[in-house]
Amino acid sequence: MSSEAPEPDAPASTDDERVSAQLFGEWEIGEIEYDDPSTRRYITVTPIAHTMGRHSEKQFKKSEISIVERLINRLMQTDENTGKKQQATKIVREAFDIVAERTDENPVQVLVTAVENAGPREETVRLKYGGISVPKAVDVAPQRRVDLALKFIAEGTYNDSFKTTTPVEEALAHQLIGAANYDLQAYPVSQKEEQERVAAAAR
């Protein structure tokens, strides 16, 4: 009987055979580039598009959720679409396919660039002096910039698709491409420019 121990089985995976997860099983997320350092920590990209609301009761934890899921959640925030997560997810997936076909780029990268471009840097608040409301320009926090960018993208999608012949996924793709290219005709960019113009006048 041999006293030598049997050779252990080879490991299931090695450093040379890493499996990279993909969003929706299609889109790589490992090489996403960020141009705006101020919003970098608030734009999270993960392969998970549905976290089951685990951060819903924790303040500011929304920044740890994938930016794709946050866009999906934004699309549900109307009377008709409330709670229809599968439908909103399907819209985003189909919009991503359209974006990839038209731009030859990773649609996740297009979304990140669109959010960076659509977030206003300044806005106005109203201060009361002796009963008189006076507008005052203030800087926008990076987390709020991301929130407003997603809001503008969702609003632009509704405006383009509600009571029109344009499919909603087509409208969303149009908003993402326009914002990523900083097209002033795109709703998210025009809203950002308008807020910054009003803020500049209130300095």
From Swiss-Prot:
GO terms for molecular function: rRNA binding; structural constituent of ribosome. Keywords: Ribonucleoprotein, Ribosomal protein, RNA-binding, rRNA-binding. Residues 1-21 are annotated as: Disordered. GO terms for cellular component: small ribosomal subunit. It comes from the Archaea. The keyword Lipoprotein does not apply. SUPFAM superfamilies: Ribosomal protein S7 (SSF47973). GO terms for biological process: translation. Pfam families: Ribosomal_S7. Belongs to the universal ribosomal protein uS7 family. Part of the 30S ribosomal subunit. One of the primary rRNA binding proteins, it binds directly to 16S rRNA where it nucleates assembly of the head domain of the 30S subunit. Is located at the subunit interface close to the decoding center. This is Small ribosomal subunit protein uS7. It comes from Natronomonas pharaonis (strain ATCC 35678 / DSM 2160 / CIP 103997 / JCM 8858 / NBRC 14720 / NCIMB 2260 / Gabara) (Halobacterium pharaonis).
